[in-house]
């Protein structure tokens, strides 16, 4: 099903982006990975190329910058010969509750997580429309659906990604372009980073109890 498909994967230098890129290459797709972490990005792409059977390249991108997105996607489409799929995991997280989130962290997460989604989707849409259709897969988060007190700005940004995805899906469907979002939960690098800040079981349980807005969490 994926053999020969032409795919761009953002955030490909680690975590879900890396896993997504490798899975596509293993399925026989031709992939261009993109990230800001160039050393890791090149290394992962080279490793994926060796395992195959698909092919993989790497291009630097800053998803929050329109010129960077436009330039990198143009290069990728030339390499691939077109664009069938955009997988967009690229995101950033900074922990802070609603009372203490800084303007700087808020702006950073919305610039990368929300504006980055809008920019990459718009550019991908342009190329897909020209070739008759395609699929855009945004990466939302369970945090965008339920309260995440320790990640207030991140949760808000992912909620915005969900809303954008619904809007783009309803708008671009007429052009044979599907826009969907997947919502990862626990086993991600962001989760493990958060877990390192709370090593005791009691602290972990307290964290999840605090996710219940009126603090009525129960044990059974």
Predicted regions and their residues:
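Conserved glycine-rich Rossmann-like NAD(P)H-binding loop of the short-chain dehydrogenase/reductase
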Residues: 27-43
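Substrate-binding pocket helix/loop in short-chain dehydrogenase/reductase
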Residues: 97-98, 105-107, 208
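Active-site loop immediately N-terminal to the catalytic Tyr-X3-Lys motif
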Residues: 99, 146-152, 174-175
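Active-site helix of classical SDR
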Residues: 121, 157, 165
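Alpha-helical segment proximal to the catalytic Tyr-Lys
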Residues: 126, 170-174
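Residue(s) in the substrate-gating loop at a strand-loop-helix junction
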Residues: 141
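C-terminal helical subdomain
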Residues: 174, 181-182, 202-220
